[in-house]
């Protein structure tokens, strides 16, 4: 059985914690899309591990971890992250790690281009992480990108890299500060170190599914950052939902969605339930809302059920993991976005609009809930939660039509209620 963990909001929902719990039984843990722009922390046995490109199943010594074909793969980040995990005691990580030979290579060139493209946008910048994810996927779509298996054909690899660099140099001129020969030299070293990790991921996943082992797939980013279904253009450059998993790994999974009990977003783009006042600052402080990858503070606001329902309609979730319920413990009153209203007609929308200009003009309809103002961190059973917290969770289920199966009440692996 293959299980996917997907984010339903704008990322940072707390997917890593559920991944850590479920990967204890998994024998394969895989990433399907994205790159080292994603980031989450896993706390296990009192140690905090940071993951960006590598699957977090590496915490389990019995689990093989695969970076799939839909990922844009940065070799330097791969070895740096692996070394950091080994320094923290994961001595088994190296032998439990595989990379698809079909994955696209993310280059230093892409990162430099990413920065220049953001500069071109000036006041309309996307707010990328600057890791070159967009340019990598752009090269993939243009069919002039470099795949992992091509690293090992030195002549072909170097010729393709020089052509890419020349093309960008024509576009940006002296603004592009990049030495192609330095990058080529780095890959001569990688060419010696990388072969033991590279596999045909299609055959590997086919064999794993046929064997009947538990497979866990970690979704990166989240549905509202999806290139097709997110708040375009303020999105990432890959399919972050179910479609990206299917193409990135070729699996037939069940789908677990992870959502915070409130809402956050990093970078630019529309965020209808954002609170820029006292409540938003309080959520940011209590929830420790700053990014693992960039350190940027996350924008915070109330739970937006319009977003969650839309996300569920795209990804066909089978269950929710509602995270960070404990962050709401001290709020006397909670607000939940339940509809968007057309400012001219006053009618509530029955859909999440693609037109961001129109969405920006829409008003948010909130429902207020009484807060519980009591700690939930030590609670292990749903029936032991305060009545108001139970009502909050049940309303999420009722509104979205998807059952809540896990509730996060703290950062630790054991801070989870199972329903």
Curated annotation (Swiss-Prot):
Domain of life of the native organism: Eukaryota
Family annotation (SUPFAM superfamilies): P-loop containing nucleoside triphosphate hydrolases
GO process annotations (BP): 'de novo' AMP biosynthetic process; cellular response to cadmium ion; IMP metabolic process
Keywords: Cytoplasm, GTP-binding, Ligase, Magnesium, Metal-binding, Nucleotide-binding, Purine biosynthesis
Gene3D superfamilies hit by this protein: Adenylosuccinate Synthetase, subunit A, domain 1, Adenylosuccinate Synthetase, subunit A, domain 2, Adenylosuccinate Synthetase, subunit A, domain 3
Subunit structure: Homodimer.
Protein name, entry field: Adenylosuccinate synthetase
Lineage: Eukaryota, Fungi, Dikarya, Ascomycota, Pezizomycotina
């Amino acid at each position: 059985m293959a299980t996917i963990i997907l984010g339903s909001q704008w990322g940072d929902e707390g997917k890593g914690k559920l991944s850590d719990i479920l990967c204890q039984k998994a024998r394969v843990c895989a990433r399907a899309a994205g790159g080292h722009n994603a980031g989450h922390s896993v706390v296990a046995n009192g140690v905090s591990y940071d993951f960006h490109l590598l699957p977090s199943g590496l915490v389990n010594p019995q689990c093989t971890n695969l970076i799939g074909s839909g990922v844009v793969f940065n070799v330097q980040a791969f070895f740096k992250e692996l070394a950091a995990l080994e320094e923290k005691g994961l001595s088994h990580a190296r032998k439990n790690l595989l990379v698809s030979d079909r994955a696209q290579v993310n280059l230093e060139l892409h990162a430099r281009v990413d920065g220049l493209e953001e500069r071109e946008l000036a006041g309309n910048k996307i707010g990328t992480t600057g890791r070159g994810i967009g340019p990598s996927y752009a090269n993939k779509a243009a069919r002039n990108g470099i795949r992992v298996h091509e690293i090992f054909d030195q002549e072909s690899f170097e010729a393709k890299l020089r052509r890419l660099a020349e093309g960008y140099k024509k576009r940006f001129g002296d603004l592009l500060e990049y030495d192609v020969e330095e990058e080529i030299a780095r890959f001569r070293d990688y060419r010696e170190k990388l072969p033991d990790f590279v596999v045909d991921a299609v055959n590997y996943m086919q064999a794993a599914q046929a064997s009947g082992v538990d497979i866990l797939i970690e979704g990166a980013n989240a549905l509202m950052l999806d290139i097709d279904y997110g708040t375009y253009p303020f999105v990432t450059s890959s399919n972050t939902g179910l479609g990206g998993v299917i193409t990135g790994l070729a699996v037939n999974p069940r789908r677990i969605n992870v959502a915070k009990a409130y809402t956050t977003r990093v970078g630019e783009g529309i965020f209808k339930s954002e609170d820029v006042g006292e409540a938003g600052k309080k959520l940011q402080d209590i929830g420790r809302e700053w990014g693992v990858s960039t350190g940027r503070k996350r924008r915070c606001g109330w739970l937006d059920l319009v977003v969650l329902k839309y996300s569920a309609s795209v990804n066909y979730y089978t269950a929710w993991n509602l995270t960070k319920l404990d962050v709401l413990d001290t709020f006397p009153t909670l607000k939940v976005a339940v509809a968007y209203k057309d400012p001219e007609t006053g009618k509530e929308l029955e859909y999440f609009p693609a037109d961001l200009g129109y969405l920006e003009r829409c008003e948010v309809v909130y429902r207020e809930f009484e807060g519980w103002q009591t700690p939930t961190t030590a609670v292990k059973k749903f029936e032991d939660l305060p009545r108001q917290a139970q009502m909050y969770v049940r309303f999420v289920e009722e509104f979205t039509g998807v059952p809540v199966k896990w509730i996060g009440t703290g950062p630790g692996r054991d801070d989870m209620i199972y329903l």
